[in-house]
């Protein structure tokens, strides 16, 4: 009798999702042949709740190694609403368990970020056989040194910074580039260093706007006619750090600032007299073909997950720890975020290069 493996992709998309799906599938088919059946669950947990399943064939996993996005579709389904019965009267947790069993699944693989893993842990606690795979361009999943999608996003954000240099220099401007990362600054830190940013602002290190302005002025005094700021979308000031989140978000709204980057650009212009511009690459950082690094990582993670399925090792998520692929208990990582620590080597590199961290 064939083992039936469900698989879904949930949350925001990123490069490497399809490569990971392929890694799982090819390894399972190679190991088990016709003794495994893969069931695709469309649009993440929404598909699990509503029974939107698709029987997959081996051919559907061919030719997708280099393809961005996800062949299964994805959708954000907030964890905080999982146990909330809304107007549709659907008990989401009960529906997911019912549809899992109706499809006669032996296990379910959940590809996603922090919220996806919280729900994966919930389902594991509810008695389902769950395996997680860590996906996010933010690189902020606890317990793993790297997530697939991160390095491709670094490449994309770095190219943006590279290209901004020439226009910044030509027009003698201060360019503020908003990089994705609401709670963790890994993407901004790595792309900022790789792209030669002069100032890098992260959520983990509240910035002093006076120091930011001083860094711009010091470059001007040194004969540099432009400055590049790499700003994480979740960056906030030392003044805001003293307030509750609702308070400082309200103050930003009252002042007409939709983002931290807009506020910083305006303040720098007022304090230095330098002409400033904002660049927001946005969802470009999540799109397109995965890098060679992410293709390899996705294949590693996918093949390892297939081994976990074969060994019936559930209630875990795949991780890279000290360059070795392993598995962490879902209960140990769910609800935790891996931010840039204060003793991070890359912060020391930035400081050694004279990059201002605000």
Name these PLM-found stretches.
Residues 8-18, 180:
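Short, glycine-rich nucleotide/cofactor-binding loops
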Residues 32-33, 123-147, 151-154, 201-208:
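Short, acidic/small-residue loops that bind anionic groups at enzyme active sites
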Residues 1-9, 20-104, 111, 115, ...:
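A cross-family phosphate/adenosyl-ligand binding-site feature
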Residues 20-24, 114-128, 188:
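Short Gly/Thr/Asp-enriched flexible loops that form oxyanion-binding sites at enzyme active sites
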Residues 10-13, 41-46, 76-77, 113-116, ...:
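Short, ordered loop/turn segments at secondary-structure junctions
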Residues 99, 110-112, 120-122, 150-171, ...:
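Accessory alpha-helical/coil subdomains and C-terminal extensions
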Residues 165, 220, 306-313:
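Short, hydrophobic alpha-helical segments
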């Amino acid at each position: 009798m064939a083992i039936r493996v469900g698989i879904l992709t949930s949350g925001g998309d990123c490069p490497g999702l399809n490569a990971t799906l392929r890694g799982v599938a090819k390894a399972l088919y190679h190991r088990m042949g016709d003794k495994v059946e893969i069931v695709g669950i469309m649009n993440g947990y929404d598909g699990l709740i509503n029974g939107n399943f698709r029987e997959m064939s081996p051919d559907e996993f061919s030719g997708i190694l280099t393809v961005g996005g996800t062949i299964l579709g994805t959708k954000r389904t907030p964890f905080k609403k999982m146990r909330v019965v809304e107007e549709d009267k659907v008990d989401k947790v009960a529906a997911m368990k019912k549809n899992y069993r109706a499809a006669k699944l032996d296990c379910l693989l959940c590809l996603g970020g922090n919220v996806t893993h919280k729900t994966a842990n919930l389902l594991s606690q509810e008695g389902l056989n769950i395996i997680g795979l860590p996906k996010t361009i933010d690189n902020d999943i606890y317990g793993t040194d790297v997530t697939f999608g991160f390095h491709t996003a670094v490449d994309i954000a770095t190219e943006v910074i590279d290209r901004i240099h020439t226009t910044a220099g030509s027009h003698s401007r201060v360019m503020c580039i908003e990089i994705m990362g609401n709670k963790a600054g890994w993407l901004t830190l790595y792309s900022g260093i790789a792209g030669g940013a002069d100032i890098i602002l992260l959520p983990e290190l509240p910035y002093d706007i006076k120091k930011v302005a001083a860094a711009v002025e010091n470059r001007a005094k040194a004969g540099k006619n432009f400055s590049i700021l790499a700003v994480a979308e979740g960056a906030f000031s030392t003044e805001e750090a003293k307030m509750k989140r609702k308070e400082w978000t309200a103050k930003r709204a009252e002042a007409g600032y939709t983002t931290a980057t807009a506020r910083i650009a305006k303040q720098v212009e007022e304090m230095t007299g330098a002409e400033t511009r904002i660049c927001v690459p946005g969802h470009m950082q999540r799109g397109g073909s995965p890098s060679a690094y992410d293709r390899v990582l996705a294949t590693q993670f996918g093949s390892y997950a297939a081994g976990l399925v074969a060994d019936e090792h559930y209630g875990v998520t795949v991780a890279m720890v000290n360059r070795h692929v392993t598995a962490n208990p879902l209960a140990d990582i769910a609800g935790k975020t891996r931010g840039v620590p204060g003793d991070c080597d890359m912060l020391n590199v930035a400081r050694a290069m004279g990059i201002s961290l605000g």
